[in-house]
């Protein structure tokens, strides 16, 4: 598999490069950044080969450094991590407008060179996924974002801790915006196949407290260590592996939907359960939700859709 990383000189891009280099199915990695960061990419390339050698790994993988997007022409997946990082005083609107311009520039050039899958990491991820979709002209299954995947993992950890069970026994997901309007699907949350509402400890489950913590989790990491890279990079590698091996896994990613869920109108990219395989997003999964969950999702959808309309002309 051939993978390109746009923004490879950044925190997520650097960690992602190492994790991908350790994957046996990855045969070529294109490290892409602005021309001012080329020397950093060259140093990263040298460091990656050292890391592989130190781990006793074959170093037959090709690692290329470039500021030219033409190297994405043969990529199976192009991962976009580039963009402005949100600072404490920056508004969501400022971040949205700034990154929309960056994403537009990259995606239009990528589309000129070939047919790839675009995996969006840059925030606000739902909006940047939508911007990448409309600017690329690609099919909607080819463009997707990290969405609420990490939020779902964080909620999964909280459920496992509360019910004192192994993480693998928990099935849950958060849908909607990767942001304050996200919606945990409690009705589809189970431990060992048993809905958590049927478990004795559910009465003490601090749902609201956990949800508020998850909503602010990313910002808390930014405040403590100026950003997260290990969690997102690890999640990205797992999703790339799903595509490489055609695993058909059900994950919660940001993808374009219009009428797949009852009660929504118009289209935008938002976090929903999807089947992930060799073609990217192979199916949007229609899960049944309780009335309050459906209403929460509709509100989240309308919020994201409104922002999507704002960035169409940027």
UniProtKB/Swiss-Prot annotation:
Disulfide bridges in this chain: none
Keywords: NAD, NADP, Oxidoreductase, Tricarboxylic acid cycle
Statement: the UniProt record of this protein carries the keyword Translocase: no
GO molecular function: L-lactate dehydrogenase activity; L-malate dehydrogenase (NAD+) activity; L-malate dehydrogenase (NADP+) activity
Enzyme class at the top of the EC tree: oxidoreductase
EC number: 1.1.1.299
Active-site residues, Swiss-Prot/TrEMBL: 178 (proton acceptor)
InterPro entries documented for this protein: L-lactate/malate_DH (IPR001557), L-lactate_DH_AS (IPR018177), Lactate/malate_DH_C (IPR022383), Lactate/malate_DH_N (IPR001236), Lactate_DH/Glyco_Ohase_4_C (IPR015955), NAD(P)-bd_dom_sf (IPR036291)
Function per UniProt: Catalyzes the reversible oxidation of malate to oxaloacetate.
Protein family membership: Belongs to the LDH/MDH superfamily.
The protein, known as: Malate dehydrogenase
Gene name of the record: mdh
